[in-house]
């Protein structure tokens, strides 16, 4: 089944692994812009990589010797040297966290309530890295911290209802201060799917409500007129990542995997990078991606300068995507231990798949 990552909110990990893994596993959850509303009440699996669009992918989760990640209603930090995990914050039993960003002693992410196997009511949330001063900032998802502000997809819903409100709406891209004040509209739109911020510009995707057209736009971070970078009727570009003045994204492909493209930030010409490559991350001159083959998920990295591909071999079976930072990778793997009901492992290793260890475990619903 092709991963519709245009689409997620959680490290994020269709199995229903609901694991918020600081930017790591996204397992096929559709949640972005207008898709957020459409998918409330649908089972989803994510690792903090999760994405409400594709934005919920974790961003900058390493601070010093620690990487931060989440599993369901818990946020952890792991010492990359000792591989020891420590609980930072525990939410209520019906909450989940994903799409973590760590900045100046604070963790920013999306918090969402869970009803059965359904994810409902997303909020922009922050908590200190010592677990104190936890606070919901706004109704919304996919927070991006940039130059002293939080950019996010603002949502409207009645959280007093037992399940997602039928009037659930996407309002557009907004910004607010790091404490949740001075909330202002940047781009009013009910069809925003996902966005990224790069060099004082916002790049976002949207689907037409009246046609089959899908778009990739750019616009100044202050708002104003948006420029069409790409228009297509063959599916929505997704998994946006900016790197070295290019926007990389997934689009097209076959039943199981996306193809990988890039567009220079000052151009409208898309360039195919490679086929069958579900984009996970870009770090230090390498593109990290996964290839789905039936029930199997293989991981690769490709050097941008010469397109040399290397398979990343781990001692564990990867079940979802991953996040790369500071020479380390964190991902979700299959966990088989007859002495516990847990069947998903959080796995930390180097960027070659070596020196790995399961640093935490949890069970799918």
For each feature predicted by the language model, list its residue ranges.
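Sec-dependent signal peptide cleavage junction
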Residues: 17-39
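Beta-strand-rich domains and repeat architectures in extracellular enzymes and scaffolds
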Residues: 42-76, 92-99
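A short beta-strand motif characteristic of beta-propeller blades
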Residues: 43-51, 84-90, 132-138, 181-187, ...
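Repeated scaffold domains used in trafficking and secretory/extracellular systems
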Residues: 53-62, 94-103, 138-147, 190-199, ...
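Residue position within the beta-strands of beta-propeller blades
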Residues: 68-70, 107-111, 150-154, 203-206, ...
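Structural motif
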Residues: 72-77, 115-125, 158-174, 210-218, ...
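Short loop/turn segments that connect beta-strands within beta-propeller blades
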Residues: 79-83, 127-132, 177-181, 220-224, ...
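Blade-level signature of beta-propeller repeat domains, shared across WD40, Kelch, NHL, RCC1
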Residues: 325-336, 341-365
